[in-house]
Amino acid sequence: MDLHVWLAFVAASLALLVIPGPTLLLVVSYALTQGRRVAVAMAAGVALGDFLAMSASLLGLGALVATSATLFTLLKWIGAVYLVWMGIGLWRSAGKAGLQGLSRPADLPAGQVFRHAALVTALNPKSIAFFVAFVPQFIAPGAPLGPQFTVMIATFVSMAALNALLFALLANRMRRFLTTPHSAAWVTRLGGAALVGMGLMTATLRRA
């Protein structure tokens, strides 16, 4: 892949990654309530989710999602239900403790955060279909596809993980304002409500 093409891909990927969506919302919610203890787990989960979604797109699943109403609807509802389920769980946990209680590893293991981040990122039919339209713009038709796909996947996944980590650390710095159980519970409920709202929005997605 030529350097100027790769730089264009990096710029386009950056613009895509900073757009708020289910993944960034989840990252910020967990960072505010769990702290930077789970930041690496979130970044790793986002990386895995994007790797699966992008790889599936390049292997043809994205084209199938874009043309199959049934598969698109199935993935849409799985993602929507999962987001609502997590939002309700986050809301219900708000009354249990303030930040000291929320930050205990036993309350929410890093492995669970990793799985949540990976699933929310991967189970987004719009992302899978988007990669189908996004990636071909940077492919050189006369060159072998394998090396180009490898470079683009490695680049995008690395940027996605770094983006999630930075958002998590920035959100973690805001935790100093959450010094009382009341404020911590308020932010937790807000995050839960936002996840439920994002799940409901996901349920209304239509194929482009």
Feature locations, PLM:
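Residue-level hotspots within the lipid-embedded alpha helices of multi-pass solute transporters
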Residues: 13-17, 121, 125, 157-165
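Core segments of transmembrane alpha-helices
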Residues: 123-132, 192-195
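Short hydrophobic "helix-edge" motifs at membrane interfaces and signal-peptide entry regions
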Residues: 10-11, 25, 113-116, 126, ...
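Cytosolic-biased juxtamembrane loops and peripheral soluble domains of multi-pass membrane proteins
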Residues: 91-120, 177
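Juxtamembrane transmembrane-helix termini in multi-pass membrane transport proteins
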Residues: 2-73, 133-152, 156, 168
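Selective transmembrane alpha-helices of multi-pass membrane proteins
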Residues: 67-98, 157-170, 175-208
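Alpha-helical transmembrane segments of integral membrane proteins, especially early/N-terminal helices
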Residues: 40-46, 82, 111-123
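Short loop-to-helix capping motifs
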Residues: 21, 35, 124-125, 180
